[in-house]
Amino acid sequence: MENVKQTIRAPRGTELQTKGWIQEAALRMLMNNLDPEVAEKPEELVVYGGIGRAARNWESYQAIVDSLKTLESDETLLVQSGKPVAIFKSHEDAPRVLLANSNLVPKWANWEHFRELEQKGLMMYGQMTAGSWIYIGTQGILQGTYETFGEAARQHFGGSLKGTLTLTAGLGGMGGAQPLAVTMNGGVVIAIDVDKRSIERRIEKRYCDMYTESLEEALAVATEYKEKKEPISIGLLGNAAEILPELVSRGITPDLVTDQTSAHDPLNGYVPAGYSLEEATKLRAEDPDRYVQLSKESMKKHVEAMLAMQEKGAIAFDYGNNIRQVAFDEGLEHAFDFPGFVPAFIRPLFCEGKGPFRWVALSGDPEDIYKTDEVILREFAHNEHLCNWIRMARQQVEFQGLPSRICWLGYGERAKFGRIINEMVASGELSAPIVIGRDHLDCGSVASPNRETEGMKDGSDAVADWPILNALINSVNGASWVSVHHGGGVGMGYSLHAGMVIVADGTEAAAKRIERVLTSDPGMGVVRHVDAGYDLAVQTAKEKGVNIPMMK
């Protein structure tokens, strides 16, 4: 695909480029995904996560933009792996856009077949929020990362990470949240990345405190701050598959160890040990098969080092990039001896229908987001943990692209919040409509046996009906755009997941759609976990009145 050097930035204000606010929202969010403040490699249409793209190629991108500008408010645009393929007459309450990205028949659901199709221009990798146009930069994963490290602190360190050292790697669009999430929980973190640009980007956006190319300096600073029980985040330039084994050989054991490199994609997401970034780029182009094999061997060493640290007392967990699976496939029989982050720390939240709920101010005015922050602080004042998050986010999170906010809200809370936001748009308190969406990593919208659905109580880890049902109910309930993707987070063959976005434009019709969608969407999370036999989900369903025919 041809790289194009152009700066894309979503329009701001209330002047429409399209025939309605829902079409306008889709257009602005597509463009926002490719804003240089937001996207990792906008010239390649790559938003985050290795090769997670917003559109298949530049011709398709322009065709999507043109289609959205002429789309009527009773029509629906269909997008197949980043390419607009049809516009059909529908109705005003139907989604304006339906997207299916990276989906392959199971027997062919592997990277090799995907790459054949990609090279022919027939498919793109949509990751989760890249191809579904609701990525908001690193903030999008920040609260989930904060919650994960917070729960680790509660389970293992008396409620705080003060006086602890976390070791991790991967400072891309997702992993870049880790340094700030650890320091928000009071801890010290060394975060490794092979790409200097990634570390510098996190420092620029205040997600990471300092940069070093010296392991000795990183360890000295980490030790100093750990002893002082003060937080600091250290971005260390290097390769985790080299640095972790070196630390093991020195007998240095962190308190926590995890990883968020893009190991889900051995070709485009991971750099083999012994190679500089430049050397790796050259090898990737000249001999991709050898590159993949070297990557997989390095991942095995990486996981071996994490297991060695676990044996010495570190709390180790997989952060959802499928690195354990690769190591296992390479012959490391005990690769799954440390858990994934969802069963270890997050699943109780899923049982309550909670997940990474986000909203974006189409006006471009940060004041609109600050006003919505006040809504959270007022309406959910009883939830001190949530309110603390909002206060910290206001102080420490720098917006990327259109102003946005994320917080984990549960069943009932999402619909309540959406209702209030729509009323604020209607009254003029907010200067333009608000886009409400979420990550595909949510309570009822993903099947991913090595991540979100790992170790389900009833063994239903691989059942993929749930994300499809989620997309179907959100579509019929009037979500503004709905997406079904394959391979996000953990790579080809390992996940199916669905996304939704709903626009609060202040109309009565929007109010009804919001009520329906923001009830059924988290409701699917409660239903999914009731079906798997989780008592907390059953309790939630009974308390909230979720109608589940065979619930006991």
Swiss-Prot record:
Annotated protein name in UniProt: Urocanate hydratase
One Gene Ontology cellular component annotation held by this UniProt entry: cytoplasm
PANTHER family reported in the protein's UniProt record: UROCANATE HYDRATASE
Residues that coordinate or bind NAD(+): 49-50, 127, 173-175, 193, 239-240, 260-264, 270-271, 319, 489
InterPro entries per record: Urocanase, Urocanase-like, Urocanase_C, Urocanase_central_sf, Urocanase_CS, Urocanase_N, Urocanase_Rossmann-like, Urocanase_sf
Protein source organism: Bacillus cytotoxicus (strain DSM 22905 / CIP 110041 / 391-98 / NVH 391-98)
SUPFAM superfamilies, per database record: Urocanase (SSF111326)
Locations listed in the record: Cytoplasm
Reactions that this protein is recorded to catalyse: 4-imidazolone-5-propanoate = trans-urocanate + H2O
Function of the molecule: Catalyzes the conversion of urocanate to 4-imidazolone-5-propionate.
Highest taxon of source: Bacteria
Gene Ontology MF terms: urocanate hydratase activity
Cofactor requirement: NAD(+)
Pathway: Amino-acid degradation; L-histidine degradation into L-glutamate; N-formimidoyl-L-glutamate from L-histidine: step 2/3
